[in-house]
Amino acid sequence: YHFIRATLESIAYSTCDLASQMEKDLGQEIVSLKVDGGASRSDFLMQIQSDYLNKDLYKPTCIETTAMGAAYLAGLAVGYWKDQNEIKENWQIEKVYKNSISEEIREQRLKGWHKAVKYSMGWAKD
């Protein structure tokens, strides 16, 4: 159990680091995230991502967006949908994950993550 939890937490921490760097590179804040794919099946992962990012996460009713995208493109090609706006109307939210921790706890956990990453750098030697 602890190994699985640590793996999911590392995904959330890594996502937080990536989003932070993206905000710096873009020069603007990412307000919220839309999540999909197999990992979004984990309520635990989605909640801690929301907590660590301090952002709302929106999970659609259909998380298999690659397959849906292919179906939408095929539908557009044969005229089933008239345009992309009609497709966008099909997107429905199943669940919204909202931050549930204080800024103090978030900072403490992120500091611990960065400390662990720093220490692990010495483990790999040429």
Set out the residue ranges of the language-model regions.
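Glycine/Thr-rich phosphate-binding loops that ligate phosphate moieties of nucleotide
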Residues: 1-126
